[in-house]
Amino acid sequence: MTLAFQLAVFALIATSSILLIGVPVVFASPDGWSSNKNVLFSGTSLWIGLVFLVGILNSLIS
């Protein structure tokens, strides 16, 4: 169970880092929002899901 929690936290940190860099780049590019809207929504949905997963796993571990 601890390994699953650690992997979920790592995935959350990695996704956060990717979104931290990717979102401003998409908004700064001329046609970025129109062409990458679905990718950003998917990344944001993944991030929200990982936040809930980490919370659930944390409550099971402690």
Curated annotation (Swiss-Prot):
It is found in: Plastid, Chloroplast thylakoid membrane. The chain crosses the membrane at residues 8-28, 41-61. It comes from the Eukaryota. GO terms for cellular component: chloroplast thylakoid membrane; photosystem II reaction center. It is a multi-pass membrane protein. InterPro entries: PSII_PsbZ, PSII_PsbZ_sf. Pfam families: Ycf9. Keywords: Chloroplast, Membrane, Photosynthesis, Photosystem II, Plastid, Reaction center, Thylakoid, Transmembrane, Transmembrane helix. HAMAP family: PSII_PsbZ (MF_00644). Belongs to the PsbZ family. PSII is composed of 1 copy each of membrane proteins PsbA, PsbB, PsbC, PsbD, PsbE, PsbF, PsbH, PsbI, PsbJ, PsbK, PsbL, PsbM, PsbT, PsbY, PsbZ, Psb30/Ycf12, at least 3 peripheral proteins of the oxygen-evolving complex and a large number of cofactors. It forms dimeric complexes. This is Photosystem II reaction center protein Z. It comes from Daucus carota. The lineage of its organism: Eukaryota, Viridiplantae, Streptophyta, Embryophyta, Tracheophyta. The gene is psbZ.
